Amino acid sequence: RRQRQMCIRDRFHAIYDIEESLYSDWMLNLLLQPLVENAIIHGVDQRPEGGGTVRITATQKKDTIVFTVEDNGVGIDPQILPNLLTQDSDGYGIKNVHERVQLYYGKEYGLQLESKQNVGTRVTLTIPACPKECHN
């Protein structure tokens, strides 16, 4: 397991905690980027006191890979949270990621959202484990 920390221009800290055995696994492109961007733009950048932390983890659990993107930002409005995976929004949002995952990997995979206002948000992405040799 490798853990790295970095400070991005004094705006926030990023912590990566990735199981090294997953470095060679294959996954669809652009699944994590929108999740991390949302954590920064709509989470930690909105903190009145500034700063904040975004933590990205990846672990293998049996035959799945579980990614989490967590922030200690402002959280998501509880009125909006239940609809984020089903309603259209601007950009390449989490609905797009969720639909792409389910279309490619199956309905048992996708995103789960947890959030508390003024505490932060956790987005969990679950996909099947796929070493490079399984994708040809």
Model-derived features: where do they sit?
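Short, small-residue-biased leader/transition segments that mark boundaries at the very start
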Residues: 1-8
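ATP phosphate-binding glycine-rich loop and adjacent ATP-lid/helix-beta elements
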Residues: 5, 28, 38, 82-110
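Conserved catalytic submotifs in the C-terminal HATPase_c
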Residues: 13-23, 116
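Conserved ATP-binding N-box helix of the HATPase_c
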Residues: 29-48
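A short beta-strand-to-loop micro-motif at the C-terminal edge of the catalytic HATPase_c
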Residues: 47-49, 112-120
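Short beta-strand/loop element within the Bergerat-fold HATPase_c
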Residues: 51-63
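Acidic ATP/Mg2+-coordinating residue in the GHKL
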Residues: 71
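A short glycine-centered beta->alpha linker in the GHKL/HATPase_c
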Residues: 75-77
